[in-house]
Amino acid sequence: MRYEKPQRGRLREHLQLNCDIFGATGRSGEIEILQLITHLMKSFGATSEHFEVLINDREIVNTVFNELMKVDEETSYKLYKIIDRAKKVSPEALDKMINELSLEESSVKILKDYLGSKSFESLFSFLDSHGKLEMVSGFKELADIASKIGLSDYLVYDPTIVRGLDYYTGIVFEVFDKNPENRRALCGGGAYANLLKIFNENPVAGVGFGLGDVTLTDF
């Protein structure tokens, strides 16, 4: 149950399927979760014409904000909120929100170049041009593995996927319906390295996703 205004794809009462992997090393857990969600969608008869998995990595976003733009923690937090809303507002509204932060002109250019990176290739080219490609080698490894095992038909890099929850530390992703009449996220998730510290002083890394029955019914 959740207390909010009922609307298409969101009801107060709903069922949610959660799948998580704990303690996996390297990128293995992330790859397995991506395989699982893709296989789950395909088991419903969906193909790459029906859905896509939009993916990003919090380490990439942090690299852009902290290493390239060199903004402070408060501004970084505001930027996360702005990018999270990027798909829901007009380009003019997005520019207005960015301008209200009074960023340096060079930082605005870096941000817009980053937001213009809409494929794995363009992202890696952007980071390489700033000498930061090695800082996201793990994400490049994930993209390479995904390509080798046949996930590349479903995975799409999207710089605006950041997920609003602060506990994500690695990949973040959302499964999107490609139907123009229901262009929305069906489910989402990501990797979190420190969340379980609230239960155990020794952190256990996790990665997973949640899928609601309401959005799945509309698919």
Indicate residue ranges for each PLM-predicted region.
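Positively charged, Gly/Ser-enriched RNA/tRNA-binding surfaces
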Residues: 1-47, 95-219
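A general alpha-helix detector
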Residues: 36, 60-64, 93
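Charged, amphipathic alpha-helical linkers/stalks
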Residues: 43, 67-68
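Short secondary-structure capping/junction motifs at helix and strand boundaries
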Residues: 45-52, 73-77
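Beta-rich nucleic-acid/ligand-interaction surfaces
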Residues: 52-67, 161-169
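Intrinsic-disorder-associated interaction segments
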Residues: 54, 69-72, 87, 100-104, ...
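Short acidic alpha-helix initiation/capping motifs at coil-to-helix transition points
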Residues: 55-56, 86-91, 134
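Acidic, His- and aromatic-enriched active-site or binding-groove loops in soluble protein domains
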Residues: 69-98, 151, 177-179
